Amino acid sequence: MDNKNVVVCDNGTGYVKCGFAGENFPTSVFPCVVGRPLLRYEESLMEQQVKDIVVGETCSELRHQLDINYPVHNGIVQNWDDMEHVWDHAFYNELKINPSDCKILLTDPPLNPSKNREKMIETMFEKYNFAGVFIQIQAVLTLYAQGLLTGLVIDSGDGVTHVVPVVDGYSFPHLTKRMNVAGRHITAYLVDLLSRRGYAMNKTADFETVREIKEKLCYISYDYKRESQLGLETTILVKNYTLPDGRVIKVGTERFQAPEALFTPELIDVEGDGMADMVFRCIQEMDIDNRMMLYQHIVLSGGSTMYPGLPSRLEKEIQDRYLDTVLKGNKDGLKKLRLRIEDPPRRKHMVYLGGAVLAGIMKDAPEFWINREDYMEEGINCLNKMSQA
């Protein structure tokens, strides 16, 4: 089967990454948003020939005139009608495929309710009529992209952060940790911090602008207290940012305060462990034979792991916890730990890359895919085949 007949689609909370098997980069990356014209704009929109529903990039351009919906929340599809509009856009406008000639590999967040998986399979066969479908857990695909079968994946995208242990290609749902702090929450926190400085940023349109500020200027501090002190005593951290309307704003300590929520979720009133605690607890709860292997292969994935300073801060925090809890302060034991955090430069699209690798290898293996006949015969029960794959 030709690579162009095997589609890979990674639906995230913020973006959909889609393309074909064996590719090194997604053919298309577009925001996972659906917009409908606000009534008062319908007349003026007629000149622009906007259809009743807009998906993806166009939403950003016309965001003042649309009611915008995000079909995926915290990694899980909440609105299936809108999700179908997103898939229509991906398959027919971006990839320009005829689904009945293609197979598709979809990605699934860890701890996704099985009802969602069932609905996904049903939509792919009933609505789009794909020839074959496979759904794989995102963390496992991240490791494939890194050439590993065993490791600990920290996947932080737009809607949710997961820490997932994987051994020999199998993930462990009962040890998987989840935190509802990721890109979108950090942007919202940055909006809040900037408003305390006197810059009002509250409209959806401004939210996009603040996201750009975050991506350009934010970083993770190595030592939060010292950095805060530095911010109080000097202006060394202050950077200027030019807004789309030409105004210039100053961004200082907010640059590291916003992403700090990944390590200290209480900052934005989210209960639970931060990223370093989740990693440490997750590995320590694993059986003892696999722990060292996981400490040596911690792989970062997703756009919210792209902050400068994140790998070194994570390494420091995990070492501190290991020293206190496991070694009881004996520093000699740290040599054996050999902690290693892998931060591949293309980690923003890691899940997609792993999917493209897997789909490329398996494109001609009939036992790998759930085909249309399986689905017609067994219905949703055909998912059992996948859990054994």
UniProtKB/Swiss-Prot annotation:
Q: Which UniProt keywords apply?
A: Actin-binding, ATP-binding, Cytoplasm, Cytoskeleton, Developmental protein, Nucleotide-binding
Instruction: Spell out the SUPFAM superfamilies in the cross-references.
Output: Actin-like ATPase domain
Inducing stimuli:
Repressed by light.
Renumbered to this chain, the signal peptide range is none
Where ATP is bound, by residue?
Answer: G157, D158, G159, R211, E212, I213, K214, E215, G302, G303, S304, T305, M306, Y307
GO terms in the biological process aspect are: actin cytoskeleton organization; actin filament organization; actin filament-based process; cell morphogenesis; multidimensional cell growth; trichome morphogenesis
Observed effect of gene inactivation: Distorted trichomes and altered epidermal cell types.
* Protein's cellular compartments: Cytoplasm, Cytoskeleton
Q: What's a Pfam family this protein contains?
A: Actin
Q: Which domain of life is it from?
A: Eukaryota
**Entry's Gene Ontology molecular function annotations:** actin binding; ATP binding
Whom does it interact with, and what assembly results?
A: Component of the Arp2/3 complex composed of ARP2, ARP3, ARPC1/p41-ARC, ARPC2/p34-ARC, ARPC3/p21-ARC, ARPC4/p20-ARC and ARPC5/p16-ARC. Interacts directly with ARP3/DIS1 and ABI1.
What name has this protein been given in UniProt? Actin-related protein 2
Q: Which organism is it from?
A: Arabidopsis thaliana
Classification from the root reads: Eukaryota, Viridiplantae, Streptophyta, Embryophyta, Tracheophyta
Gene encoding this polypeptide? ARP2
